[in-house]
């Protein structure tokens, strides 16, 4: 009886495993990650592999902090982490191409593993994690970059930029005082006004149009009405509106 029970369990286990493979539900802990990432056509499977890569990255980032590691081991671990970061990016691109969530949209934002723990140093390009930043040659690069960043001043504090500008930068260009240029601009302005007037001659004025004083060539300029005149005009219009309603 025990033998038959073991056979049944084994057959059931193989059936469930084949069924999970058909549905794209794979146990990532017992299966080796595929190398041909672009050939994967299941979003759940890609999500599983991406999660496994994140776990590996988090584990190696924690290990690279150990003080017992030699410089060679630290360099090898740092190379492995960078390879895993590139693999993670490839899985994210494949998930996006299949219509899944776009994990690459954040660009150089912070990266977290499945447990919500931030992976320090993650981003684009080759990165140094943990004790790899203290390696000979790498530490000097970080110190030089930090010193260069500290020496840079904001644009508001750079007096040399203000010393290099002249009046032309602020619009007081000597070209604006050129007689030939001013005459050319005046001629072009007159030509534009004449074209506008010619185009308006054939147009019909809208109903209720009242030309301003001085537009008819009578020589009288337009004067701004006073507050009393405006109030009296509004009262007259309201009276006329009431009379029309009666």
UniProtKB/Swiss-Prot annotation:
<comment type="function">
    <text>Involved in pre-mRNA splicing.</text>
</comment>
<dbReference type="GO" id="GO:0000350">
    <property type="term" value="P:generation of catalytic spliceosome for second transesterification step"/>
</dbReference>
<keyword id="KW-0963">Cytoplasm</keyword>
<dbReference type="GO" id="GO:0005681">
    <property type="term" value="C:spliceosomal complex"/>
</dbReference>
<protein>
    <recommendedName>
        <fullName>Pre-mRNA-splicing factor ISY1</fullName>
    </recommendedName>
</protein>
<dbReference type="InterPro" id="IPR009360">
    <property type="entry name" value="Isy1"/>
</dbReference>
<dbReference type="Pfam" id="PF06246">
    <property type="entry name" value="Isy1"/>
</dbReference>
<keyword id="KW-0508">mRNA splicing</keyword>
<comment type="similarity">
    <text>Belongs to the ISY1 family.</text>
</comment>
<dbReference type="InterPro" id="IPR037200">
    <property type="entry name" value="Isy1_sf"/>
</dbReference>
<dbReference type="GO" id="GO:0005737">
    <property type="term" value="C:cytoplasm"/>
</dbReference>
<keyword id="KW-0507">mRNA processing</keyword>
<keyword id="KW-0747">Spliceosome</keyword>
<dbReference type="InterPro" id="IPR029012">
    <property type="entry name" value="Helix_hairpin_bin_sf"/>
</dbReference>
<comment type="subunit">
    <text>Associated with the spliceosome.</text>
</comment>
<feature type="region of interest" description="Disordered">
    <location>
        <begin position="196"/>
        <end position="223"/>
    </location>
</feature>
<keyword id="KW-0539">Nucleus</keyword>
């Amino acid at each position: 009886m025990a033998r038959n029970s073991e056979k049944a369990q084994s057959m059931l286990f193989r059936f469930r495993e084949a069924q999970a493979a058909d549905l794209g539900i794979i146990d990532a802990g017992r299966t080796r990650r595929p190398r041909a990432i672009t050939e994967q056509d299941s979003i759940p499977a890609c999500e599983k592999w991406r999660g496994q890569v994140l776990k590996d990255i988090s584990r190696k980032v924690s290990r690279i902090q150990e003080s017992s590691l030699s410089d060679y081991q630290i360099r090898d671990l740092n190379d492995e982490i960078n390879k895993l970061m590139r693999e993670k990016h490839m899985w994210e691109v494949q998930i996006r191409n299949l219509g899944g969530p776009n994990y690459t949209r954040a660009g150089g934002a912070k990266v977290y593993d499945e447990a919500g723990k931030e992976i320090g140093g993650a981003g684009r390009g080759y990165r140094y994690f943990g004790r790899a930043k203290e390696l000979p040659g790498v530490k000097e690069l970080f110190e030089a970059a930090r010193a260069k960043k500290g020496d840079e001043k904001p644009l508001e504090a750079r007096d040399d930029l203000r010393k290099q500008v002249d009046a032309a930068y602020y619009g007081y260009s000597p070209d604006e005082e050129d007689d030939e240029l001013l005459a050319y601009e005046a001629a072009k302005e007159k030509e534009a006004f004449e074209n506008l007037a010619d185009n308006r001659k054939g147009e019909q004025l809208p109903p209720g149009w009242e030309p301003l004083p001085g537009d008819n060539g009578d020589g009288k300029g337009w004067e701004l009405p006073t507050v009393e005149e405006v109030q009296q005009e509004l009262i007259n219009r309201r009276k006329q509106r009431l009379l029309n309603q009666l």
